[in-house]
């Protein structure tokens, strides 16, 4: 039996050197499907299951769902800033502190699921209009001190989505919920 890394069930993110138009198109399609896959992973869970951490010391399923909404809202804004400003410095946020706010710990996930559905609809509509040149635009991340291109950010957020959905589905598998 293969052991799953509970922190990184799909492995760590590895940026690509070059990204083809076909790869970007595939990622956009995947990003569009994320809200439905997340909803499918959590829609039949009880409150007790939603409040179960995906690993010791990890977030609960509920916190993961709300984190995805928080994170992807920030990413969408970063894309818009990068398209309208010259290499903007983004404002990082403390995702751990956000996950400890009461709404992240207690709110019904349905609000974040609905938000993600609409957000990903807008985000992918925007992404489908971008030229290769626009995908080369980027933002400066002061924590990593790097410029992140939009095409690499797209790949990162596809990975981020799969990463957290895998936290949930792997927990469900281990607990015998699915």
From Swiss-Prot:
Cofactor note: Binds 1 zinc ion per subunit. Is able to bind nickel instead of zinc.
GO cellular component: cytoplasm
Predominant location: cytoplasm
EC nos: 3.-.-.-
GO molecular function, one term: hydrolase activity
Keyword Hydrolase: yes
Positions annotated to bind Zn(2+): 67, 160, 164
Entry superkingdom: Bacteria
Cofactor field: Zn(2+); Ni(2+)
Alphabetized UniProt keyword annotations: Cytoplasm, Hydrolase, Metal-binding, Nickel, Zinc
Keyword Transferase: no
Subcellular location: Cytoplasm
The protein's assembly and partners: Homodimer.
Family stated for the protein in its record: Belongs to the metal hydrolase YfiT family.
The protein's role, per its UniProt record: Possible metal-dependent hydrolase.
Protein's name according to its UniProt entry: Putative metal-dependent hydrolase YfiT
